[in-house]
Curated annotation (Swiss-Prot):
The gene is Ezy-1. Residues 1-28 form the signal peptide. Keywords: Signal. Transmembrane segments: none annotated. This is Ezy-1 protein. Residues 415-425 have a biased composition (Basic and acidic residues).
Amino acid sequence: MQLSNSLRSARSAAASSGCALASRPVVACRRVTPSVTRPGPFTIATGPLLPASRSKAGGGIRVFSSALYEFGQQLKEDLDHDLSRARVDAIANKTRIAELEQQRRILMAVGGMADDEPELKAALMQLEEILGVSFNELQLMLAETLADHPAKMDNLAAMAAVVGTGSDGGGDESGDRDTADAADADGDGGERAWLRFKADVHACLADLRNRKDGITLHRAIVKDMVRASSNPGARRSSSSVDKMARQELDRLMPFLLDDFLDKMPGLKAAFTGKAEPGAEGDDGEGEEEGEAQDVGEDAVDSSSSGGGGGVLSCAAWQQVLGRTVRAVSPTLALVLARGYLAMAPRQYRALALVRMILPGKTGGGVDGALTRKEGLSLLKKLRPGISGLADKDKQWLEWVIARLAAEFAVQSAGDGHEPEPKRPELPPTAVQRKPPAEEQHKPTAGARDSPNM
């Protein structure tokens, strides 16, 4: 009984569990064979990210656009334009310079200048445009004379580098000089020449500001002035002058210059021809005082004749450089020799043109490019009879060459056989070569060139 009951209960439990299991096949079937289809796994597209019309090369896509980018592009275009224009201008300038060089070669090769004067003036006008230098009629006449004598031009090619200071020798002050020349005929020409000389020295020293070595020369001249000055307010030591700035030197030099020139022994007498009251030479000899008076008379005579315009004559200029200025301040003598063209008569100042019409020539110069050997060679060309130069320093050669080259430029142009012109006296240290024995008793023009100077 109990067994049948247990079996019956087991069957009922199995039947109930079977009903439960019978209701689950649907769920089990969903897992094996789902009734709803799901999408497949996610895949990355391999096609272009951008549209085909915009992904092509050269499609004009601007990756970055801003005001800075626009400015950079404009700046690049402007620089390219300026560079192209500069290249064109440089080529044009080189072509023009080559044409002028050819003009110069033609002029140097021509024996006579009668038919070539228009070409010379045209070349000078072109040089005026390039160099910014004005040429007056007197300079044109000198250029024609030089071109008419190629041998003289060849010598002056080297001399111009020594004497030419870059000044156009122009006519800015010509009106003032003409007025002063007219006044000299009515009054004391020597005194006016002395005042004009002092003004020219001021201008010559003021020009040192524009020179590369100007501060060095400026300082050396101030040292000489301080050393010779008796003014208590101007007393300075050499070390203090070395420490001065350019502005302080510029203020001190004009304060000392007039007194320095007035007290320089024999300098004023070279202009006025009058012996200085109470002046005594260092060597106690009266010979130099007499020579200074003679030289001063020559200077006044030359100014009254209209040739020098109240400016130092050749001999007087040599006196200033050799006997006075150089003895007190060698640096000042060198600076004045450099600036001689600005202080000389107009026909001498025209020598500055030589440097302009010979741009292709290479030469020396008082700034150091002229070697001692070149200076000796050039000096012997200017003065073939000079000797005794072995012990002369380079500075001595520079200011003597500067003086003689100016004289050489204005010698009268003849057929090449003209008599030897009168030459200025050299310093007493220069020894003249004696003429041969058979010529010593002949009265020649060279007799006035005495070796005892």
